[in-house]
Structure formats: C-alpha cells, structure tokens
Amino acid sequence: PLHLHEISAQDEPRIDMHDAELNRVLGGGLVPGSIVLLGGEPGIGKSTLTLQTILHMDNRRVLYVSGEESTHQIKMRAERIGGNSEVMILCETSLEDIFDNIKEVKPELVVIDSIQTISTSDVERSPGSITQVRECAAALLRFAKTSGIPVILIGHINKEGTLAGPKLLEHIVDTVIQFEGDQHYMYRILRSIKNRFGSTSELGI
C-alpha cells in the first residue's frame, strides 16, 4: 500500500474522443482504464455514434467488437462516415475469444457492441440474461483496471427504461451515458447519469 502523501494528485491524462460534446459529458475525455456504458433504446443510433467517434481517433489503436453486425455491414457504415481505416473490427460473442484477440492486437481502446450479445463459458445462461451481462461486464471491468485500457460498452434500454436488466450495470461501470432522443427530431441528447470522474450535470447534443 501507499501512504496518501505518496500518491500524486495530478489528474491522469484523458483520451481525446475527437467529439467536443462527448468529451464534455465524459468530464474532459475518456479516463484510461475506465469502463463506460453508453445506453439507449434500440435503433436510436448508439452504434453509429460510437463508430463515428472512433473513426475520427486517428492516433489510437481501437478494437471494435460487434456481436450484432457482420464485418461487411460495419464496413458499409464506416465508408459512409469516413475516417480512420485502421480501426480493427472483430465480430465475436465469446468473451474468452474476445480477450484472446485483445491480447493479440493490443488495442488502446475496446468497444463492445453490445454487452447483451456477449457471453462467457463460466456462466450457464443465454446471452443477454442478467447473469451473463453482469459476469461479462465484471470481467471487462477487471480487464480495464488491470490493463489501463478503457472499455466502452453499448447497452440497450428495455421497455421499462432500464439498462441491460435492471440497474445492475450502473453499479459495475465507472460512467453511464444515456443516449436520448425521438425518431421525429433531428437532435439526440447525451446525458451523464453516473460519472466517477466528472459531473453528472453535463449534456451533449
């Protein structure tokens, strides 16, 4: 253990997300080793927002893990958006295989789209179940804290308005950002509802 006076109070450098609104909602950028949950209703644009963000991070080695779309589908969306073609795409739902790929490519940021599609062989439940979601999120949290590599989890809000099965994920992750809006309006809102490293009073449009 360290004595309190031995610990530097200097803020750890944050990762620039190349999106002023997202940076502000995060509290000034993404904290290394943190785990962020981006939640919202299915179809509101969580995947597009995240893909758009990482495609503009030219100086970062990013691994985008999709359990919902094929590489071809992601490629088509990425071409429409434009940006960093060096982003690595992995279509996988096994948490163990995801970790094997992470060890191989050594990314600086990992995106999981979505946490409801990922499963671990340690749990005898189907993907998307409360037990699977909780165990996978906890394993990804341990990975982020020990490696210093930040993880962004995309999670769907159900009809009751909760993230990925009651509020179980909100207690595990460092930051929860809710992506809100209406299909009839042009603008969407990013709302921070939990942030260990910043304010929860910030909104992004």
Task: Show the residue positions of the predicted features.
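Short regulatory helix/loop adjacent to the ATP-binding pocket of P-loop NTPases
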Residues: 78, 162-172
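Conserved P-loop NTPase "ATPase switch" module shared by AAA+ and STAND
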Residues: 105-125
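Substrate-engagement module of ASCE P-loop NTPases
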Residues: 131-152, 156, 172-183
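Conserved P-loop NTPase
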Residues: 1-4, 104-107, 116, 172, ...
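Conserved nucleotide-binding/hydrolysis micro-motifs of P-loop NTPases
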Residues: 42-44, 68-72, 80-83, 93-97, ...
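The Walker A/P-loop phosphate-binding site
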Residues: 1-84, 99, 103
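Flexible beta-alpha connector loops of hexameric P-loop NTPases
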Residues: 11-14, 39, 63, 83-92, ...
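Loop/turn-to-beta-strand initiation segments
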Residues: 61, 85-86, 106-109, 146-153
